[in-house]
Amino acid sequence: MELGKSIENHNDVVVRLTKHVIATVANGSNLVFSPISINVLLSLIAAGSCSVTKEQILSFLMLPSTDHLNLVLAQIIDGGTEKSDLRLSIANGVWIDKFFSLKLSFKDLLENSYKATCSQVDFASKPSEVIDEVNTWAEVHTNGLIKQILSRDSIDTIRSSTLVLANAVYFKGAWSSKFDANMTKKNDFHLLDGTSVKVPFMTNYEDQYLRSYDGFKVLRLPYIEDQRQFSMYIYLPNDKEGLAPLLEKIGSEPSFFDNHIPLHCISVGAFRIPKFKFSFEFNASEVLKDMGLTSPFNNGGGLTEMVDSPSNGDDLYVSSILHKACIEVDEEGTEAAAVSVGVVSCTSFRRNPDFVADRPFLFTVREDKSGVILFMGQVLDPSKH
């Protein structure tokens, strides 16, 4: 499979995941999540699984092997520098019970291919310490944006665990054309229930990457680039009730994101987008099971290639995959982070069109040269943090 096809498949999985998350757990709220974080964790689980479980995960990810996901990741990680205005880091962590040991082949894969840190812990006697350790790891690898991924309510689950796998994604990008904070003013944002809230809107007088399509507009806001080029895309329905039809359209058109990219800067009339900052967390394993990925979560989940044990890992299964993401968009740029933890057990414009994002919209953060989507979400109410 060519790299381009792998990325296209990855983005198709993104859309499927987004539709299911919105339909089942978003409950009419703001949403942000990192599909790449969930996919990396699934890839890591596949690498430690027997053939049946591995094949089901790879089929879900629409990839022939875990190597293809590593190639996708390389497209967005490579190219950064310490002094860059753009920061992207993806980290993996593994915690294994002190009475078990990782199979050498799996440990080698974790450390060399996934660059994962591995620690031995006492799940049964010191579950609170394990929770603190995982949460500290998440905080460090998201630059403090996510301070807790495991709650105290998970003590019983942790106490009976053998293995905890975690992935963290952190992104911070500065706009290539920043907004002047002195021009930020409060305006009405119209909610789905017909009411409105006053929120700060950013604006500037620069030309914008903007294009109109049937029923919606797309705005591209580039970040300062290094060897990579990241952008935020805002997909704004023309109608206040147009979000659901737009999501349906995105899900029904192959390569939607590649086919709806504003390529030219144009003069814009009224131009306003809201500042927003929020987090979202959900049990990703429940969504994945609803989508047909069941094998890793069943008793005898086939995680036979992970640990050395008398049962050869036959009794291991993934009890849950927890995902938490947060995002902040302001005049300077975007800061976003996500952590996934798996516990084993074109229409032409009239002149100077407007772009006023004063109603619910979808967004992505994507690397433009490869097309990889890093974050995706919806903004229903920017006043909710």
From Swiss-Prot:
The record marks T347, S348 as: Reactive bond. Probable serine protease inhibitor. The reactive center loop (RCL) extends out from the body of the protein and directs binding to the target protease. The protease cleaves the serpin at the reactive site within the RCL, establishing a covalent linkage between the carboxyl group of the serpin reactive site and the serine hydroxyl of the protease. The resulting inactive serpin-protease complex is highly stable. It comes from Arabidopsis thaliana. This is Serpin-Z10. Keywords: Protease inhibitor, Serine protease inhibitor. The lineage of its organism: Eukaryota, Viridiplantae, Streptophyta, Embryophyta, Tracheophyta. GO terms for molecular function: serine-type endopeptidase inhibitor activity. Pfam families: Serpin. One of its GO terms (cellular component) is extracellular space. Belongs to the serpin family. InterPro entries: Serpin_CS (IPR023795), Serpin_dom (IPR023796), Serpin_fam (IPR000215), Serpin_sf (IPR036186), Serpin_sf_1 (IPR042178), Serpin_sf_2 (IPR042185). Signal peptide: none annotated. Residues 333-357 are annotated as: RCL.
